[in-house]
Amino acid sequence: MAPRTLLLVLSGALALTETWAGSHSLRYFSTAVSRPGRREPQYRYIAVEYVDDTQFLRFDSDAAIPRMEPRAPWVEQEGPQYWERTTGYAKANARTDRVALRKLLLRYNQSEAGSHTLQGMNGCDMGPDGRLLRGYHQHAYDGKDYISLNEDLRSWTAADTVARITQRFYEAEEYAEEFRTYLEGECLELLRRYLENGKETLQRADPPKAHVAHHPISDREATLRCWALGFYPAEITLTWQRDGEEQTQDTELVETRPAGDGTFQKWAAVVVPSGEEQRYTCHVQHEGLPQPLTLRWESSSQPTIPIVGIVAGLAVLAVVVTGAVVAAVMWRRKSSDRNRGSYSQPTM
C-alpha cells in the first residue's frame, strides 16, 4: 500500500536561519472512511494539518465545495496559488486513499458491507537549531497499526503479512529515501515558514490557570483533583506529592486535551483519606510559568492556595507530554496511498 501524501508544497518557502525556542512539529493527519452504499461503498476523506498543537488547515471531501480551508488567521494571508495547490493535493490524496481502501478490502478478504478506515500521520520535528529531530510516516487500517517508517528514516516496520506486501513495494521503490529527502528539506522549510508567519500565535506561552477541587467519596475518602486550564503549548507536567513524596502510582492522570479556544486543559487526581488533605500538594510545571506552581486544598472557605515556586530544593519534574504524543492521541495513525507534496507517491 502506498504512502500518503504529506504536506502541501509551497512555492517560495522561506529558508529561515534564526534559532527557535524549543522544538516544533509539523503534522498532517488524515482519515479515509468507506461506508456501505446502495450500489457501492461511499467514501469520505478528512485531513487536518497542525503546527505544534495548533490546527491551521482542514479538508473534508463531503463539504459542499471540497477545498482546503484555513483554520488559523495567519494562514489566510497565503495567496490563491497556495490554496489551489493545497486543495489539489488533498483531492489527490482522497482519490488515492479510496483506491487503497479497495485494495485492502481484497487483501484482507473483507466485505464491502462494513465500514473501514484508513488513517495516517506524516510530518517532522525540528530542533531549536532548525535541524530535523525526527520524521514520521505512519499508517493504520481499521484502527490497528499497518506500516510505519522507522526512526532511522531508512527502513519500515510492517504489522502483518498484508502490510509486508506494502513494505516490499516501498523498498523496491526506495520510497524511504525519497521521503527522507522531503523531511530533511521541504518539511522543515514549511515548518519554518509557518512559524514565522504565525509567530504571535505559535510561539506564545500562555500559563495555566490552576486550582484544586475536592470531591468526597465517602466518610473515609475524598478525591483531590488538580486542574490546569487555558495553557499553551500543550506540554505540561502535573504531579501530586504526599509529605513531599511523589504519588506517581496512585495518581490518575488524563491526557492533555484541547479546550476548544486554542488552549489546553489537563487534570491529575488522587484519592486521599478524609482529614489528610493538607498533606497533599499538586505541582504544576509549564513553560509559561516563571516558576513552578504548588497548590494545596485547604477548606471550603479557601478551596485552593497557590504557592509560587517555593521550595528551594524542588526537583525539576521531567515528565513532558510532547506535541507528538498529543497528536498521536488525537488521531490513531492511518495508512494510505498518495502523492506527496512536489512529487508523486507510489501506489499500492
From Swiss-Prot:
UniProt cross-references to Pfam families, sorted A to Z: C1-set (PF07654), MHC_I (PF00129)
Region (Alpha-3), start-end ranges: 206-297
Example of a GO MF term: signaling receptor binding
Residues exposed to the Extracellular side: 22-307
Location of region: Alpha-2: 114-205
Cytoplasmic side stretches: 332-348
Gene Ontology biological process terms, A to Z: antigen processing and presentation of endogenous peptide antigen via MHC class I via ER pathway, TAP-independent; antigen processing and presentation of endogenous peptide antigen via MHC class Ib; immune response; positive regulation of T cell mediated cytotoxicity
Alpha-1: annotated span: 22-113
InterPro entries the UniProt entry points to: Ig-like_dom, Ig-like_dom_sf, Ig-like_fold, Ig/MHC_CS, Ig_C1-set, MHC_class-I_related, MHC_I-like_Ag-recog, MHC_I-like_Ag-recog_sf
Signal peptide: 1-21
Transmembrane stretches, start-end: 308-331
Disulphide bond pairs: 124-187, 226-282
Keyword Membrane included in the entry's annotation: yes
UniProt KW keywords: Disulfide bond, Glycoprotein, Immunity, Membrane, MHC I, Signal, Transmembrane, Transmembrane helix
Keyword Membrane annotated: yes
Domain Ig-like C1-type: 208-296
Annotated glycosylation sites: 109
Alphabetical list of Gene3D superfamilies matching this protein: Immunoglobulins, MHC class I-like antigen recognition-like
SUPFAM superfamilies for the chain: Immunoglobulin (SSF48726), MHC antigen-recognition domain (SSF54452)
Region (Connecting peptide): 298-307
Function: Involved in the presentation of foreign antigens to the immune system.
Record note on quaternary structure: Heterodimer of an alpha chain and a beta chain (beta-2-microglobulin).
Protein name: Mamu class I histocompatibility antigen, alpha chain F
Organism this protein belongs to: Macaca mulatta
Gene: Mamu-F
